[in-house]
């Protein structure tokens, strides 16, 4: 309730941030994530990096997470299944799937039915922007350098 009220009040600021997020390069995203891993002394392994997606495992020997940043308008069930199978193949039990666009309804349905098998957190562009700490401050400029993925590790 509070979250939807916040989104309603700050819709213009969120839309500006979302437009800027859609323009970010995968190279910049990878730099931010890797720098945060180094600062937090976390092990990481880049699995895939191309113009549209960045896939990385982050964590320690005991607890690992698979993080996907996907620049696409809509994530399909095929993309989700690929991510889910990669988690199972690598024995990772926590996944974070971030997209600059939205998830198709099939993906949400599959996540709901698979939640006991895989723990995958889905974040569309709007949810990701709202979770950023700087968006909650007044008169704060939107900057790529202020993006943070630390809370997802």
Regions found by a protein language model. Give the residues of each.
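Mixed-charge (Asp/Glu-Lys/Arg
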Residues: 1-153
């Amino acid at each position: 309730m509070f979250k939807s009220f916040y989104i309603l009040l700050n819709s213009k600021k969120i839309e500006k941030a979302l437009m800027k997020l859609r323009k970010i390069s995968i190279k910049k995203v990878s730099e931010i994530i890797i720098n945060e891993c180094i600062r937090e002394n976390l092990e990481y392994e880049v699995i895939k990096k191309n113009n549209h997606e960045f896939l990385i495992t982050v964590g320690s020997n005991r607890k690992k997470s698979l993080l996907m940043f996907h620049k696409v308008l809509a994530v399909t069930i095929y993309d989700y299944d690929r991510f889910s199978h990669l988690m199972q193949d690598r024995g990772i039990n926590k996944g974070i799937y971030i997209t600059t666009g939205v998830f198709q309804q099939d993906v949400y349905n599959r996540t709901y039915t698979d939640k006991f098998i895989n723990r995958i957190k889905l974040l569309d562009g709007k949810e990701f922007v709202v979770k950023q700490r700087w968006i909650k401050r007044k008169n704060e400029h939107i900057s790529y350098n202020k993006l943070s993925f630390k809370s997802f590790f």
